[in-house]
């Protein structure tokens, strides 16, 4: 079977490519360029960096599989970054990874797989697709510590037959062992937890740079007592805090 593997440059997607190749599949590696600097360059910090792309290229070379980098920066900016800024401007807290999976990654990967005559798209997510009552369902990974089904919940039923999550039954330590046994340079690479287009920077500065927040305000409790101030709703997340003697919302 010809399978398109989404390669991020991390150990998980590297092992997916290696496992599928070892099982005799015809594997094609693809990395999405989603975010770029002012001069069109890939970022140097966070995830989805130039170094990550280079790591993916080296893994593909080691495995002797074709490898491509595809530019989806326009789609990512329109669907993910704009949504991220807009939601914070409304006082909401977005999850950009969920929106990226919903409106960018899987649609484009499935479309690209079709163009390359691939039957499936495989990713390094920790989740499972299980057949139940003649239909496919998204389930949690066996290794719950790394389960990522929550960022995949938006996958529609028509997409599931076209997707494979080979790591759904494998633990993270096992993944690293497999990578080491295959001689992959990503075997002990650290996992990235950063928002790819924010990196190590403060997300509030990123949002402020893209929209004008000129109004500060008070933070009040349920009795309208002022308990603090804020510099704009984008700096706050909607939470509810309860204590024995007082309650407030932010």
Feature names for model-found ranges:
Residues 128-129, 216-230:
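Active-site and channel-lining beta-strand-loop segments
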Residues 148, 193, 247-249:
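Glutamine-centric residue-chemistry signal
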Residues 154-222:
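Internal nucleotide-binding/catalytic subdomain
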């Amino acid at each position: 079977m010809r399978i398109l593997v989404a390669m991020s440059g991390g150990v998980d997607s590297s092992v997916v490519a290696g496992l599928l190749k070892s099982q005799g599949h015809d594997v094609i590696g693809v990395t999405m360029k989603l975010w770029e600097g002012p001069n069109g360059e890939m970022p140097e910090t966070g995830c989805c960096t130039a170094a990550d792309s280079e790591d993916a290229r080296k893994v593909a070379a080691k495995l002797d599989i074709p490898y491509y980098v595809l530019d989806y920066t326009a789609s990512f900016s329109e669907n993910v970054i704009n949504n991220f800024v807009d939601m914070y401007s409304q006082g909401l807290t977005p999850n950009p990874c969920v929106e990226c999976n919903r409106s960018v990654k899987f649609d484009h990967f499935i479309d690209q797989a079709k163009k390359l005559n691939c039957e499936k798209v495989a990713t390094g997510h920790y989740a499972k697709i299980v057949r139940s009552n003649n239909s496919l369902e998204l389930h949690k990974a066996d290794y719950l510590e790394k389960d990522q089904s929550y960022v995949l919940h938006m996958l529609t039923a028509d997409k599931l037959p076209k997707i494979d999550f080979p790591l759904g039954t494998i633990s993270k330590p096992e993944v690293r062992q497999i990578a080491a046994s295959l001689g992959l340079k990503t075997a002990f690479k650290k996992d990235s937890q950063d928002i790819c287009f924010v990196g190590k920077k403060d997300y509030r500065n990123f949002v402020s740079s893209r929209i004008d927040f000129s109004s500060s305000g008070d933070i009040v409790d349920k009795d309208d007592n002022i308990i603090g101030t804020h510099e704009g709703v984008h700096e706050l997340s909607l939470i509810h805090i309860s204590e024995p003697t007082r309650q407030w919302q932010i």
